[in-house]
Amino acid sequence: MAEYKKNNNNDDKDYIEKLVNIRRVVKVVKGGRIFGFSALVVVGDGNGKVGYGTGKAREVPVAIQKAMDKARKRMKSVSLVNGTLHYPIVSSVGAAKVYMQPASEGTGVIAGGPMRSVLEAVGVHNILAKCNGTRNPISVVRATVEGLTSMSSPQLVAAKRGKTVDQITRKG
């Protein structure tokens, strides 16, 4: 359900908007049932920025629009190298445990469900990923975004340690 849409804000950026999940929720009252909808959306620019949002409303389009607005407001930057990660990451939120590992060129995005949406929106092209624990889409998306944003670039690590990037990234 990935769609390229023009952002309605003042800046002229194209975002990748992915609808991850829609849930129908019911409130039982004396006169019967009241139906509502909850939507989970991931928005990214395909170049290292990603955000997610949830929206609730009585109608599906309104819930999706609310979720997209929240996702655009909460966009975070991710440090990538050649369309993949710098190093393997493990992140967890609640019972959702997410493992992401960089992959060589041509591997593609090997991830399931909500993780795939986040990784494609942020602009990752080669990655191996696995989700353990709960398969709750909201928890999986949160864990994936937190893991990606917690990753620091070799330049930042080298600056903190007072070394050069070659000393940090050297194999052996």
Swiss-Prot record:
Cellular component terms per the entry's GO annotation: small ribosomal subunit
InterPro entries per record: Ribosomal_Su5_D2-typ_SF, Ribosomal_uS5, Ribosomal_uS5_bac-type, Ribosomal_uS5_C, Ribosomal_uS5_N, Ribosomal_uS5_N_CS, Ribsml_uS5_D2-typ_fold_subgr
GO molecular function: rRNA binding; structural constituent of ribosome
Pfam family, one: Ribosomal_S5
Keyword Plastid listed: no
Keyword set includes Disulfide bond: no
Gene Ontology process terms (BP): translation
PANTHER family the UniProt entry points to: MITOCHONDRIAL RIBOSOMAL PROTEIN S5
Comment on protein domains: The N-terminal domain interacts with the head of the 30S subunit; the C-terminal domain interacts with the body and contacts protein S4. The interaction surface between S4 and S5 is involved in control of translational fidelity.
Known function: With S4 and S12 plays an important role in translational accuracy.
UniProt subunit comment: Part of the 30S ribosomal subunit. Contacts proteins S4 and S8.
Family statement: Belongs to the universal ribosomal protein uS5 family.
Protein name in the entry: Small ribosomal subunit protein uS5
